Amino acid sequence: MKSFLKMTLAVIAGLILTGILFFVIMLSVISGIAAAGNKPAEIAEKSVLVLKTGTAIPDRTNSNPLSMLDPFSLTFTPEAGLNDILKNLRKAASDEKISGILIENGLMPSGWATADELRIALKEFKQSGKFIYSYSDYVLMQESYFVSTAADAIWLNPTSMFDFKGLAAEVTFYKDALEKLGVEVQVIRHGKFKGAVEPYILDKLSDENRLQISKYVGSIWEYAVKAISESRGVSVERVMQLADSLSGYNAALLTGAGLIDGTIYRDQLEDSIRSAAGIEEGKKINFVSMTKYSKVPEKHSGGLAKSKIAVIYAEGSIVMGEGDETNIGGNSYASVLREVRRDTAIKAVVFRVNSRGGDAIASDMIWREVELTSKVKPVVVSMGNYAASGGYYISAAADKILASPMTVTGSIGVFGLIPNAQTLLDKKLGISSDVVKTNSHSDFPSIMRPLTAFEKEVLQSNVERTYSTFTGVVAAGRGMSQANVDSLGQGHVWSGTDAADAGLVDSFGGLNDAIKEAASLAKLETYRLVERPAAVDIYSRLLKEMSGEVREKIVSRELGEAARYYYDLKEIISSRGVQAVMPCYIDIY
């Protein structure tokens, strides 16, 4: 018995020591990678910069090493954000060591507005006289193709396909599933177009929601088709005809029509690159990733300039509290804006917003700080793929708002959502509860019972008051009457093109254009950029986020496409109170 206990304790001690050792090793490896990432890099002559499209490209490069870790293979796959990609394209244009760019097309969407910014930046790079080639090993997606129309040549692998068919917007509905589970979603809303709640109370699109989706998806596709037509020298009518006929499954037809330049194997692609770059036949090509090129120092970067422009990145859902790198915390972003406002060296602010919205109170907190900041120094909003509902709310007080024609914005409307899981818990799972109250509504709101008529009335009043505040904020920021904003509001979602026509956006442009606009408003000839929120200390971040980052990767890996449904249903449970969110999970593909 004694020997058994000794052996058991030894095994337990061994497991604990192994776990500690593994943690220390992982911490050392990750810290080493993070430290190495700060060292300047050098590249060889006649290098080719690689731009990977068809991947999830965040607005800002994630400085968290855990985001680069694949928990299954324990390998690191660093990826650059849009901010660094745009810097790299500008830098590469004048870098004598960069001969050209290869666009490697993948399968994941990064967002149409992001694609538009990349395409514009590539066209500017092209003015340097250097080559741009585009290649797809597998399936060329429409979004990647749109970016690739800035290239000198677009090639496909002979066995690959081009998924060219026009845009579709798909909405997933949970009403019947929730009813079967015994969950009632109680909704209080303002705005006939507020489609964010429809997946929980309907089993198909309302006429109003179908109308608005058709309009903004049609606007985005119209812009894309026009750009394709101009770049490839193919009429708009012919482009539409090719999309209608699913011609992407016949590469020869696409080549003949002029949408692509042909099909070649990778060795033939590399021969073409060698020829364009002046590299000897058979010699290895030095391909440079965006992540590596970000570490190459830029000449004349303005690093010594005293005046600064702060670029604040706000990406994800708007939530109460501090938030994290995947969302926008009301408290933390209010603090960032206060800090930027008080810093006298910062002469202007670019507020990059890429959000479908979120908590109404958190949105109002951020808006207030933007308004106060705009009274002290110029604030320019740069809208990404989305700046809708709460995303528009936090943008409204800026001096200027820039967006892509492909940005999805507007959705000026609010709603309240309270799940009632009484049937699920009581009838299906046998879980009941009892409550002792000091007042009539001490347990309000509760997922254990339905709302009373009075409680619904209180929530409706709160929603109406919040909507009035929202339209007032927009009216003040955009110089409109509140009645005019109401006519544009009601939860209506707009494309960037239509938002500009409606006066919700000042002009078209991406992040680079917003920075130039901010410099112009602040009358700055020389300046340097500082990015906010500031990077968190690596050790604090590792300890705080290790479990969360790995958990999210495991969920995404195991559920794949279905992971979005998991997060959507999870949000139902967490979303209490008044929300300002656009229709959720509308896939445009």
Locate the predicted segments by residue.
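Charged, glycine-interspersed solvent-exposed loop segments at helix/strand-loop junctions
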Residues: K175-R274, Q422-A502, D506-S507, N512-E517, ...
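Cleft-lining beta-strand/loop regions that shape enzyme active-site pockets
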Residues: P40, L49-V171, S301-L424
